[in-house]
């Protein structure tokens, strides 16, 4: 225990700012939904459609940016700030090209929005909101890339503060532009989109300014300025980033398709499913935050070639995530019905949602452990296996099992939710197995 205590403290110190920043994102999402919903039902429906379309893009961009963190942490572990700064330049190129490819696809899809089965009366709301949110993705990519760089230097507080202030600006912008306060025009859903765009521009510029002007990053700036762009180095970043982006994209896609299947049952089932997934994000938020903190620790020790400490850092992260999963499970068991009533008072929806509390609890440990060992792998930068593990777990197991349990077995939403557990409990041991394979190549001294 005494050997693990420093690792507990360090992982918590890194993870808590990430968690606080993510709580801010969730609060902003709730505020957006409530304000748009109170403005007009058509605006809420249009926002839900566009946000669901861009949700997968957001996860792909976010996952892709995660490839940079362990590379930077490894350089920092060796004291190579010049090299870490140069790596940021290559990562910005790689992330920019990846985002442009995704936005090109989304631009093509824009011209087929009217073929996606949405009510015709929503299209005048959907089209401008789609354009604004799509444009904001460029700034999301820039913020994510630079934030993963600062996180990799063990500075997780900077990203937290910028996220929190950006979210506050977004909420203020919503009030001014959705409803038209004072000299500001009443723009409804478009106002919410513009507020999101402006807040994302602010966050991107703010984190760039921190790296460009803060004294802490002076040595990194020297490396950034002195390092020329290199296609070889950019491709190297891509090989470490693309597997993580695709892994998170497939995981997100499995959850999205599970929602679609719930909608095949009826509207109350879809509503209940969405409510429980939203509640479940509270657990996911903490698992991923502290998993990211553990990943930074692992990468730092990999950079030092200290594999004994890699093992200790991973074990400490596992203990923290198990404790978080236990706390989340108890919270959902005790307060689940209260959380559900916060979202809806419809008795049919509430009844279905309450029946999903136990399946929600079941998947907490699978989720925590797959996040633990996925992040441990990410910390070692041995990430190629993450693609096939995600494909097997989420595409081969989760989605077909959801259909089989939900429909032929007549378990409906309960079956679809249980299939999520099957996917997560498939991913967790596979990630663990791959991490152990990496450790066997580097026996502790």
Regions found by a protein language model. Give the residues of each.
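Small-residue-rich hydrophobic transmembrane alpha-helices
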Residues: 44-107, 140-159, 259, 272-336, ...
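Hydrophobic/aromatic residues in alpha-helical transmembrane segments
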Residues: 16, 32, 68-69, 108-109, ...
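Short alpha-helical transmembrane segments in multi-pass integral membrane proteins
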Residues: 1-18, 72-138, 184-242, 298-363, ...
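Transmembrane helical elements of multi-pass membrane transporters/channels
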Residues: 13-32, 132, 166, 199-203, ...
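N-terminal transmembrane alpha-helices
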Residues: 3-34, 38-39, 52-67, 71, ...
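Helix-terminus/linker motif at the lipid-water interface of multi-pass membrane proteins
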Residues: 23, 27-45, 113-120, 176-187, ...
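Transmembrane alpha-helical segments of integral membrane proteins
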Residues: 176-177, 397-406
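Short runs within selected transmembrane alpha-helices of multi-pass transporters and secretion channels
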Residues: 65, 133-152, 159-167, 192-208, ...
């Amino acid at each position: 225990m005494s050997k693990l205590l420093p690792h507990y403290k360090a992982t918590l110190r890194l993870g808590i700012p990430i968690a606080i920043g993510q709580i801010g994102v969730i609060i902003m999402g709730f505020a957006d939904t409530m304000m748009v919903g109170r403005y007009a039902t058509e605006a809420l429906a249009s926002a839900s459609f566009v946000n669901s379309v861009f949700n997968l893009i957001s996860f792909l961009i976010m996952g892709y940016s995660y490839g940079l963190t362990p590379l930077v942490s490894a350089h920092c572990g060796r004291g190579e700030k010049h090299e870490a700064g140069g790596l940021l330049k290559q990562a910005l190129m790689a992330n920019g090209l990846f985002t442009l490819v995704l936005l090109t696809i989304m631009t093509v899809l824009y011209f087929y929005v009217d073929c996606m089965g949405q009510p015709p009366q929503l299209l005048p709301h959907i089209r401008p909101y789609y354009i604004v949110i799509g444009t904001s993705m460029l700034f999301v990519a820039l913020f994510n890339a630079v934030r993963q760089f600062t996180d990799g230097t063990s500075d997780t507080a900077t990203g937290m503060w910028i996220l929190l202030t950006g979210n506050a600006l977004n909420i203020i912008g919503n009030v001014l532009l959705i409803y038209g306060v004072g000299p500001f025009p009443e723009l409804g859903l478009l106002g919410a989109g513009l507020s999101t765009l402006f807040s994302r521009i602010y966050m991107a510029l703010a984190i760039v300014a921190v790296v460009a002007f803060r004294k802490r990053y002076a040595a990194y700036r020297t490396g950034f300025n002195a390092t020329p762009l290199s296609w070889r180095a950019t491709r190297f970043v891509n090989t470490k980033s693309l597997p993580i982006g695709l892994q998170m994209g497939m995981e997100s896609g499995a959850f999205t398709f599970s929602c679609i299947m719930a909608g095949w049952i009826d509207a109350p089932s879809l509503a209940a499913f969405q409510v429980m997934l939203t509640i479940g994000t509270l657990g996911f938020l903490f698992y991923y935050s502290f998993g990211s903190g553990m990943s930074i620790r692992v990468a730092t020790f990999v950079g030092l070639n200290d594999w004994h400490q890699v093992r200790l850092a991973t074990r400490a992260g596992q203990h923290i995530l198990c404790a978080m999963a236990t706390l989340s499970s108890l919270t959902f068991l005790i307060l689940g019905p209260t959380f559900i009533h916060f979202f809806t008072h419809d008795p049919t929806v509430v009844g279905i949602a309450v029946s999903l509390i136990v399946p929600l609890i079941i998947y907490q440990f699978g989720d925590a452990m797959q996040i633990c060992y996925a992040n441990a792998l990410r910390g070692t930068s041995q990430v190629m296996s993450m693609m096939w593990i995600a494909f097997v777990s989420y595409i081969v197991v989760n989605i077909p099992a959801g259909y089989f349990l939900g429909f032929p077995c007549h378990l409906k939403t309960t079956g679809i939710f249980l299939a999520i557990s099957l996917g997560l409990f498939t991913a967790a041991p596979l990630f663990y197995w791959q991490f152990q394979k990496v450790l066997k190549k580097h026996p502790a001294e």
